[in-house]
A protein has these predicted regions:
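Outer-membrane beta-barrel translocator/receptor signature
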Residues: 53-62, 68-140, 168-171
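Transmembrane beta-strand segments of Gram-negative outer membrane beta-barrel proteins
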Residues: 25-50, 68-85
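Outer-membrane beta-barrel porins/channels
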Residues: 20-44, 112-467
Length: 467
C-alpha cells in the first residue's frame, strides 16, 4: 500500500523531495548546465579532446585559441546518427526502449588571414561553429502489482508503470577569433549562443483491480514545455613549450539562460485544471579547462583535457520554487569534473583516431525514502548515483585526406548507470506534487526507484574542404 505518513529522511533529501520534480533537477544539469559536444567526426573520434591542439572550428567547443593554430581556410559539415537505449529494471522486471535520431550535428568554418608584418603576429583567423544534439530520452520503469493504491472503499489499483519522457534538442552557435604569435603562442576568444527546446512528461499508470482498466496520471505541473536561449563567452590560450609539447587553458563564463516555460497544473482552488506560463532566468556553472598535448611528429599527436566547474547552477529567485532549487544545488551539487583523452596517427593520407572521456557524478549521496522491491514497505536508503551518475565515453574514427578535400567517420559509445526515483508526490497546505488523472489523485510519501542502464551509440560522417 502507498503509505500516508511522512518518513524520516536527511534534511537535504527531504527538502528536495518535497518541492521539486525529478525531471526539473535532471534537466537543469543534463541540458542547461552542459555544452553540446558534437563537433566534426575528427573531434568526436578523439572524445572532444583538442584543447592544446586546435586547428579547426571545433576548437570553439573547448578552447578558441585553437583557431589561431589554423594556417589554411576550412569548411565542413557533419551528419550525426545518435542511438539512445535505456534499460530500466525494478522488482525483477525490466523494460528496454531505444530511439535513433539523424541530424545535422555540426557545421564549422575557419577563415585565415596571414599578416604580412615584421612583428611576431603571423595570422588572425575567424571561425564559426554550430553544434546540435538531441535531448530525446525515454525512461519507462516497470510496475509492481504489490503497490496498491486505495482511491475509495470500492476502487483500488496497482502500479503498472511509470515513464519520464523528454523530447527536445540543445544547440550551440559560436563565433570566434584566434591569433598566432610566432607559431608558438596562440590566443582566442569566442561568443556562444545557445538554444534549447524541452518537452517533458512525468506519467504514472495504474491498473484497476476491479475491471483491469488502465488509468494514467500526470505529476503536478507536468507536462511542461520550455523554449530557451542563452549566451556565454570563452577565452583561451595555447603555448608551445618546445616542438613536441603544448599546453592550453580556457575559461567559459556561465551560460545565462532565459527560459520561457508553459506547464499544466491541476486541482487549483480557483482555476481547476489549466495551463500557465512563467519565465525563468538560470545561470549555469563557470567552467575552466586545462590541456596538454604531445606532438611526436607530423604523424602522431596526443591530447589530454581536464574541465572543472567552478560554480554551481543557480536560478534567479522569483518565488519559492527557485529558492528550493538553489538550496538543493547549493547543498548537493558537486562541481563538474571531466577528463578527455584523444589521439591521432597518420599513415600518409590515412588517419586513425581514438579517445576516451569520463564525466563525474553531479551529486553527493542523497538519502530518500523508497519502497522495497516487494512494494510492501518503505525504507530509507542513501544513493550516490541518484538521478544522474558518472558517464564513460569510448570513441574511435578513420579519415582520408584527398589534399584539399577530406572525409572522416567516427563512432562513440557512451554509458551510464543510475538510480531513477519516481512516483513520490505529496498534497498538503503548502505543497502539491501529487499525480493527477481526470478523476483521481495519487499521493505517496516514498519513491519507487528503478535501476537504469543508459547506452548511446553515435555515428558521425564529416565532409570537409580546405582552401
Amino acid at each position: 500500500m502507498l503509505k500516508k505518513s511522512l518518513v524520516l529522511m536527511s534534511v537535504a533529501a527531504a527538502f528536495y523531495a518535497q518541492a521539486q520534480d525529478v525531471s526539473v533537477i535532471r534537466n537543469t544539469v543534463d541540458a542547461y548546465s552542459s555544452t553540446p559536444m558534437v563537433g566534426s567526426a575528427k573531434f568526436n573520434a578523439m572524445a572532444g579532446s583538442n584543447g592544446a591542439l586546435g586547428g579547426d572550428a571545433s576548437s570553439l567547443l573547448t578552447n578558441p585559441a585553437g583557431l589561431g593554430v589554423a594556417i589554411s581556410g576550412e569548411i565542413s559539415g557533419t551528419l550525426s546518427v545518435s542511438g539512445n537505449k535505456n534499460t530500466s529494471a525494478w522488482a525483477g522486471s525490466s523494460i528496454n526502449y531505444s530511439k535513433t535520431n539523424t541530424d545535422l550535428g555540426n557545421v564549422g568554418g575557419v577563415l585565415t588571414f596571414p599578416l604580412m608584418t615584421e612583428t611576431g603576429w603571423k595570422f588572425i583567423n575567424v571561425g564559426v561553429n554550430y553544434s546540435n544534439q538531441s535531448l530525446d530520452n525515454y525512461v519507462e520503469s516497470p510496475g509492481n502489482s504489490n503497490l496498491i493504491y486505495d482511491f475509495d472503499t470500492n476502487k483500488s489499483s496497482s502500479l503498472s508503470g511509470h515513464a519520464y519522457n523528454r523530447y527536445g534538442y540543445l544547440s550551440k552557435t559560436s563565433f570566434g577569433v584566434g591569433a598566432n604569435y610566432n607559431h608558438s603562442v596562440y590566443v582566442g576568444a569566442g561568443l556562444n549562443f545557445f538554444n534549447a527546446s524541452i518537452d517533458q512528461y512525468d506519467t504514472a499508470a495504474f491498473n484497476s483491480l476491479q475491471n483491469g482498466s488502465t488509468e494514467y496520471f500526470s505529476k503536478q505541473n507536468t507536462p511542461y514545455f520550455e523554449r530557451s536561449s542563452g549566451f556565454s563567452a570563452t577565452l583561451g590560450v595555447i603555448g608551445k613549450l618546445n616542438p613536441n609539447f603544448r599546453i592550453g587553458a580556457a575559461i567559459e563564463t556561465p551560460t545565462f539562460w532565459t527560459i520561457d516555460r508553459n506547464y499544466n497544473f491541476y486541482n487549483d482552488a480557483n482555476l481547476g485544471d489549466d495551463m500557465a506560463y512563467e519565465g525563468r532566468r538560470f545561470t549555469s556553472p563557470l567552467k575552466a579547462t586545462v590541456s596538454a598535448a604531445f606532438v611526436a611528429s607530423k604523424n602522431f599527436s596526443l591530447n589530454v583535457d581536464y574541465t572543472l566547474g567552478l560554480t554551481k547552477p543557480k536560478y534567479r529567485v522569483d518565488g519559492g520554487a527557485e529558492t528550493e532549487l538553489n538550496d538543493f544545488f547549493k547543498d548537493n551539487y558537486k562541481n563538474l569534473s571531466e577528463v578527455r583523452i584523444g589521439g591521432e596517427y597518420r599513415i600518409k593520407q590515412f588517419r586513425v583516431r581514438g579517445g576516451y572521456s569520463f564525466v563525474s557524478s553531479p551529486f553527493d549521496a542523497l538519502t530518500i525514502s523508497r519502497f522495497n522491491d516487494a512494494g510492501t514497505s518503505s525504507v530509507d536508503q542513501s544513493y550516490n548515483n541518484l538521478i544522474l551518475n558518472n558517464r564513460n565515453l569510448l570513441s574511435f574514427g578513420l579519415g582520408y585526406d584527398f589534399k584539399s578535400f577530406y572525409v572522416d567517420a567516427s563512432y562513440q559509445n557512451i554509458t551510464s548507470k543510475y538510480s531513477n526515483p519516481f512516483l513520490r508526490g505529496v498534497l498538503n497546505g503548502n505543497t502539491d506534487s501529487a499525480y493527477y488523472s481526470p478523476s483521481n489523485i495519487v499521493t505517496s510519501d516514498s519513491y519507487a526507484v528503478s535501476d537504469v542502464k543508459n547506452s548511446r551509440n553515435n555515428f558521425f560522417l564529416t565532409f570537409g574542404w580546405k582552401f
